[in-house]
Amino acid sequence: GNVTMPWGSTPKGWVKFMEERPYFSGSFMWTGFDYHGETNPFYHSNVSSSFGTIDICGMEKPPFYYYKSWWTDGVVLKLTPHWNFRKGDKVTVAVFTNCEEITLLLNGKKIETRKIEKYDQALFTLDFEPGVLEVVGTKNGNTYTDKLETSGKTSSVTVTEIEPITKSGDIAIYE
């Protein structure tokens, strides 16, 4: 028969649920990808769901790395979301990993080292400071890194029309 998780379950809840049932041969997660329609809980001007672990453009969202760190033997070490804020902002970043231990550094200065337990993600809240935010992880004696860098000022943007509008109602395409 069907065994289901309640609607709105967290990735952590889902992973634990699966792990406790070794007799399962697989699972299905609704939804893996964002899709057009069902804009709940947002309605006005939204055109797609935001529940997937991969967005509508095919880019991985943070929960993707949580699941990946659970189901793969390969190393997963992902620092999210980005490092472009205002100086002094309080920012929470997440590290999704299957490393045994991680160290967070800001501009080369150690912020904190943590042991990572199964099913956990590491959350850090710190004051934004422009530069490089880096996480160093260790697994089986090997060291891995991921980093986020503050971007500089945009100097220019170039847009090129590759398919012009030929009749009313058409869509122009740019790159």
Predicted feature locations:
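Extended substrate-binding grooves/exosites of carbohydrate-active enzymes
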Residues: G1-K115, Q121-F128, V132-N142
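Short S/T/G/P-enriched beta-strand
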Residues: T72-T92, L148-E175
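A short, polar/proline- and glycine-enriched secondary-structure boundary/capping micro-motif
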Residues: K115-E117, V157-T158
